[in-house]
A protein has these predicted regions:
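Buried hydrophobic residues that stabilize the cores of well-folded domains
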Residues: 1-154
């Protein structure tokens, strides 16, 4: 990607825990052909049943060469089966709603740099006879209006 006359390339490295879940992703960036260098990272925390319950985002402070936490997302779940469980692939696709075994009911985003960007999303489901979501309503606190979702199964 070219930005302001410079060419940027990026790369991601994934670390896995003993359960085979992605526990960390590290972003590396190369500018104008320079060697790849650390840029940012995310850490993932799971519950005992495999639900992704925490997501911590960090950036690299180039002055100290230490990671500084910038965000913290807490995720809550129901006890019903998630209709699409992608596991690690959900993280690669940045679809954290499809990483876990159960359905997200609430996601609380804490922006540690600017609390004005904090957000809460709540999910309300109507389930079919197989205990999978038939419809959902997602409400973001900042917007206040429910967003309808319909699930289709084959």
């Amino acid at each position: 990607q070219v930005v302001a006359g410079s060419t940027y390339r990026d790369s991601l490295v994934y670390k896995y825990n003993g359960a085979g879940q992605v526990s960390e992703e590290v972003y590396y960036v190369s500018i104008d052909g320079s060697p790849f260098a650390d840029w940012a990272k995310n850490e993932f925390v799971y519950s005992g049943n495999g639900n992704l319950t925490e997501y911590k985002g960090y950036f690299l402070d180039v002055n100290t060469m230490n990671y500084v936490q910038a965000s913290h997302i807490l995720v809550e779940f129901d006890n019903k089966t998630n209709p699409l469980i992608l596991g690690a692939e959900g993280i690669l696709l940045e679809q954290i709603n499809f990483v876990s075994a159960n359905n997200v009911t609430k996601a609380t985003v804490n922006d540690l740099e600017d609390p004005a960007n904090n957000e809460v999303a709540t999910y309300a489901y109507v389930y079919n006879d197989k205990s999978k979501p038939a419809t959902a309503s997602i409400t973001f606190q900042s917007i206040g209006l429910p967003i309808p979702v319909t699930f289709h199964y084959q």
